[in-house]
From Swiss-Prot:
Protein name: Sarcoplasmic/endoplasmic reticulum calcium ATPase 2
Source species: Oryctolagus cuniculus (Rabbit)
Catalytic activity: Ca(2+)(in) + ATP + H2O = Ca(2+)(out) + ADP + phosphate + H(+)
Gene: ATP2A2
Region (Interaction with PLN): 787-807, 931-942
Superkingdom as given in the UniProt entry: Eukaryota
PROSITE patterns the UniProt entry points to: ATPASE_E1_E2
Residues in compartment: Cytoplasmic: 1-48, 111-253, 314-756, 808-827, 917-929, 985-1042
Length: 1042
């Protein structure tokens, strides 16, 4: 039924043709069941395991690897001789990588689907209905309830469907609907129509929503929606419709894979075409087909060389390390790629309650009457420190601490707060914090009594558990609470009837009253001044109300409660307590004692975090279900708005936002910093608008209602105290529910992205080097310098360790002084592409050069000519060009060992280059990242292992090197550092100056100024080593001459 909240009870019952006392007939139930179906949320049709597995192989990079593995496997099958076993190593290793990758992917996907299933937790199993086949209420399965059923609900029940209340059978009906609306305080319901057809769920006071809990009272109602038509069902549909966006990193890697695949394909085809002339060479037995297959194998080797197989593993490791660091800061990341997405967050949409504020109501101001003279009066105003439930704080008057027992009015005010109260404080030893037991408002009054300590109770030496209610206990020992007149909507107050524990002639029974100021003060005939009772005049009443209005609408927007007493109440026997309509008669002729103002205070650390966000170019938007006045007041206190800033067109209620046309709504999302009184659908709409501006949005939420928006936002952030649905729909969970934790996570995300850029570029330049190496050997006609199994070893192991260690690079000091990076910014810019291409070309040329050195110039080598080396395939005994040359030397393991050793050593030097994008090694020495130094040592140790420990040299087709050969390796490898230092210098001084927020002061050109910040220990270590390496003779010049 549409808009049931706007209809009267009679209209709703008439719509379903049902009587409240008898319920539906079985015939009606059958028809309605056929029309509306079962009252349950349909199970999510998840993808089958096979579909999920196939999905993992849709990535282009993965498909290329798979193709390379299949071709390698086929070629290995037809391999002959000693290489048969080693030929199978390559396809098996690639397949293992792909299987591991698929397992991780499937596991992550499975987790994502659990969010919708978690909604079913909120479906009750049973419901109590009235139907015509029985004369009394009957319990049936909740899924059998249909629209039109008359349902009975009582305290502790879970509401089985969306229900329009028809009658309330207790004084009040309180409902905890926090899972749906995010409201932390239980809501008082009534049966009157709510005329507004566009009312938000918070304002539908005559409706009960499926999945919410009854906190107090008993009532009856008619079911108006079941299953997917309920509010919780609409949330489920929205979640099903929400497609998970790929993170910026995933998009970047997809683009990179696409570019790489095109480049690889072109190079492979080019290598094959270049060598068409060699297909008939004698070494292939003169068979064109065998020649074609041989060069096809080289092209496959090239594909393996070009693909950074270690990249998925290194990225996963880096993100996992990042999540561990974040977990220490109370940010628990559920989805690995979202760690990096945090780094480009440009908007944070945050809930108010519990995230920007403490979610711990606290009294911060109060007043009592000081003097009254006719229509004029003066007030004693006090402020109270402390913003949590901890009973620690002081009462101040004119910024000076006061002793509350010196004011009679404060003693009586504390007595009312302690006795007219059903809540208490409790110390949670496990968490080490004070918590509320009961309602938030009443707990704030309990905490105030502890801070006031009006009877000067000795508190020293008490344990924290005893301290929690020490002062309240003293007051409760003086008077005994006989009964309570519960809160009701008509009088907006509650009261307790108390009698003295030690009866005497002077001490009599009293009623203590608290409630909304306008309701209570209208029923006050007197006011308390000190210990005397003075008649209330119109002037005094006006003065009191003007102060309360100022508190309620000023910069604090406090929630005010008036406190009063009835000094001579009727005796209990004279009261008719069964009918709550009589309660207002007994709460008249009251004496006004004072007023307290409370609020949910902002967290102390939030203001500095909001300031940090502003510095970092991140817009903070508060989105709350609270009213606009309170929301704007909190925004001013934490710095989202300035103290005097005009909030026109910057703060909207959900209703105001809906009334705007689409163009104005876009503008609102572009400029606004506060949305109040919103529904979940508004959150999703705001996220959509922000995404249309290419903003990367982080959205916080804790209720079931927040799940669709959490799923839609790039970064969904659930509260640690939130619902299971919110947590499963989100990418990150805040263990401490604290806004400042989000800002710390954003900072960590930026640092992780910077480090990731470094190791991705490091791995790419390594792969470029390998491609150039294979391309050069093919183009020059040299023997193979590197074989696939060696390339796999380098890509996965020796490169993988330093790449992972680059994830530990220290973050830049000014990381939060820069605006968020553009998510569309390429991973590798034009200049960086040139830079790493240049480095890669050197790596490839040096690797080929090392192999050529052994053939042409090494003392223990064959010393063949360049022509003989480049035409080695024509080597035969009867060829005059190869007279005196043993053709077997072209299959020697030494040149491969030289090439592999140079490749590994250059990569270690390259890892040092990647310590910083543009900072020189002279200013940022290797020990800035001790993990990197350790990983380089480990990688070199592993290289020595495969060189010198049998039978590994046989598997990798290499052989041990002597000292001279190692010196040559160092001579060829070290120039890569000088080369990158030159490129960094160009970038620093000519291409990328001015990217910093703060421009450096101009420096003088003195020698001291130029060497400032240089790490002299590094200089003293490296210079003698380089001089020694290049002073030894290794026939390096012979290679260059040839």
């Amino acid at each position: 039924m549409e808009n049931a909240h706007t209809k009267t009870v009679e209209e709703v019952l008439g719509h379903f043709g049902v009587n409240e006392s008898t319920g539906l007939s079985l015939e009606q139930v059958k028809k309605l069941k056929e029309r509306w179906g079962s009252n349950e949320l349909p199970a999510e049709e998840g993808k089958t395991l096979l579909e999920l597995v196939i999905e993992q192989f849709e990535d282009l990079l993965v498909r290329i690897l798979l193709l390379a593995a299949c071709i390698s496997f086929v070629l290995a099958w037809f391999e002959e001789g000693e290489e048969t076993i080693t030929a199978f190593v390559e396809p098996f290793v690639i397949l293992l990588i792909l299987v591991a990758n698929a397992i991780v992917g499937v596991w992550q996907e499975r987790n994502a689907e659990n969010a919708i299933e978690a909604l079913k937790e909120y479906e009750p199993e049973m419901g109590k209905v009235y139907r015509q086949d029985r004369k009394s209420v009957q319990r049936i399965k909740a899924k059998d309830i249909v629209p039109g059923d008359i349902v009975e609900i009582a305290v502790g029940d879970k509401v089985p469907a969306d229900i329009r209340l028809t009658s309330i059978k207790s004084t009040t009906l309180r409902v905890d609907q926090s899972i749906l609306t995010g409201e932390s305080v239980s809501v008082i319901k009534h049966t009157d129509p709510v005329p507004d057809p566009r009312a938000v769920n918070q304002d539908k006071k005559n409706m009960l929503f499926s999945g919410t809990n009854i906190a107090a009272g008993k009532a009856m109602g008619v079911v108006v929606a079941t299953g997917v038509n309920t509010e919780i069902g609409k949330i489920r549909d929205e979640m099903v419709a929400t497609e998970q966006e790929r993170t910026p990193l995933q998009q970047k890697l997809d683009e990179f894979g696409e570019q790489l695949s095109k480049v690889i394909s072109l190079i492979c085809i080019a290598v094959w075409i270049i060598n068409i002339g060699h297909f008939n060479d004698p070494v292939h037995g003169g068979s064109w087909i065998r020649g074609a297959i041989y060069y096809f194998k080289i092209a496959v080797a090239l594909a393996v060389a070009a693909i950074p197989e270690g990249l998925p593993a290194v990225i996963t490791t880096c993100l996992a390390l990042g999540t561990r660091r974040m977990a220490k800061k109370n940010a628990i990341v559920r989805s690995l790629p979202s760690v990096e997405t945090l780094g480009c967050t440009s908007v944070i949409c945050s809930d108010k309650t519990g995230t920007l504020t403490t979610n711990q109501m606290s009294v911060c101001r109060m007043f009592i009457l000081d003097k009254v003279d006719g229509d004029t009066c003066s007030l004693n105003e006090f402020t109270i420190t402390g913003s949590t439930y901890a009973p620690i704080g002081e009462v101040h008057k004119d910024d000076k601490p006061v002793k509350c027992h010196q004011y009679d009015g404060l003693v009586e005010l504390a007595t009312i707060c302690a006795l007219c109260n059903d809540s208490a404080l409790d110390y949670n030893e496990a968490k080490g914090v004070y918590e509320k037991v009961g309602e938030a408002t009443e707990t704030a009054l309990t905490c105030l009594v502890e801070k006031m300590n009006v009877f000067d109770t000795e508190l020293k030496g008490l344990s924290k558990i005893e301290r929690a209610n020490a002062c309240n206990s003293v007051i409760k020992q003086l008077m005994k609470k006989e009964f309570t007149l519960e809160f009701s909507r008509d009088r907006k107050s509650m009261s307790v009837y108390c009698t003295p524990n030690k009866p005497s002639r002077t001490s009599m029974s009293k009623m203590f009253v608290k409630g909304a100021p306008e309701g209570v003060i209208d029923r006050c005939t007197h006011i308390r001044v000190g210990s005397t009772k003075v008649p209330m005049t119109a002037g005094v009443k006006q003065k009191i109300m003007s102060v309360i209005r100022e508190w309620g609408s000023g910069s604090d927007t406090l929630r005010c409660l008036a406190l009063a007493t009835h000094d001579n109440p009727l005796r209990r026997e004279e009261m008719h307590l069964k009918d709550s309509a009589n309660f207002i008669k007994y709460e008249t002729n009251l004496t006004f004692v004072g007023c307290v103002g409370m609020l949910d205070p902002p967290r102390i650390e939030v203001a500095s975090s909001v300031k940090l966000c502003r510095q970092a170019g991140i817009r903070v938007i508060m989105i709350t279900g609270d009213n606009k006045g309170t929301a704007v007041a909190i925004c001013r206190r934490i710095g989202i708005f300035g103290q005097e800033e005009d909030v026109t067109a910057k703060a909207f209620t959900g209703r105001e936002f809906d009334e705007l046309n689409p163009s104005a709504q876009r503008d609102a999302c572009l400029n606004a910093r506060c949305f109040a009184r919103v529904e979940p659908s508004h959150k999703s709409k705001i996220v959509e608008f922000l995404q249309s501006f290419d903003e990367i949005t982080a959205m916080t939420g804790d209720g079931v209602n927040d799940a669709p928006a959490l799923k839609k936002a790039e970064i969904g952030i659930a509260m640690g105290s939130g619902t299971a649905v919110a947590k499963t729909a989100s990418e990150m969970v805040l263990a401490d529910d604290n806004f400042s934790t989000i800002v710390a996570a954003v900072e960590e995300g930026r640092a992780i992205y910077n480090n990731m850029k470094q190791f991705i570029r490091y791995l790419i330049s390594s792969n470029v080097g390998e491609v150039v190496c294979i391309f050069l050997t093919a183009a020059l006609g040299f023997p193979e310098a590197l074989i696939p199994v060696q390339l796999l070893w380098v890509n996965l192991v020796t490169d993988g360790l330093p790449a992972t260690a680059l994830g530990f690079n220290p973050p830049d000091l000014d990381i939060m002084n820069k605006p968020p990076r553009n998510p569309k910014e390429p991973l590798i810019s034009g200049w960086l592409f040139f830079r790493y291409l240049a480095i890669g070309c050197y790596v490839g040329a040096a690797t080929v050069g090392a192999a050529a050195w052994w053939f042409i110039a090494a003392d223990g080598g064959p010393r063949v000519s360049f022509y003989q080396l480049s035409h080695f395939l024509q080597c035969k005994e009867d060829n005059p060009d190869f007279e005196g040359v043993d053709c077997a030397i072209f299959e020697s393991p030494y040149p491969m060992t030289m090439a592999l050793s140079v490749l590994v050593t250059i990569e270690m030097c390259n890892a040092l280059n990647s310590l910083s994008e543009n900072q020189s090694l002279l200013r940022m020495p290797p020990w800035e990242n001790i993990w990197l130094v350790g990983s380089i040592c480990l990688s070199m140790s592993l290289h020595f292992l495969i060189l010198y420990v049998e039978p590994l040299p046989l598997i990798f087709q290499i052989t041990p090197l002597n000292v001279t050969q190692w010196l040559m390796v160092l001579k060829i490898s070290l120039p890569v550092i000088l080369m990158d230092e030159t490129l960094k210098f160009v970038a620093r001084n000519y291409l990328e100056p001015g990217k910093e927020c703060v421009q450096p002061a101009p420096q003088s050109c003195s020698l001291w100024a130029c060497t400032e910040g240089v790490s002299w220990p590094f200089v003293l270590l490296i210079v003698p080593l380089v001089m020694w390496v290049y002073s030894t003779d290794t026939n390096f010049s012979d290679l260059l001459w040839s």
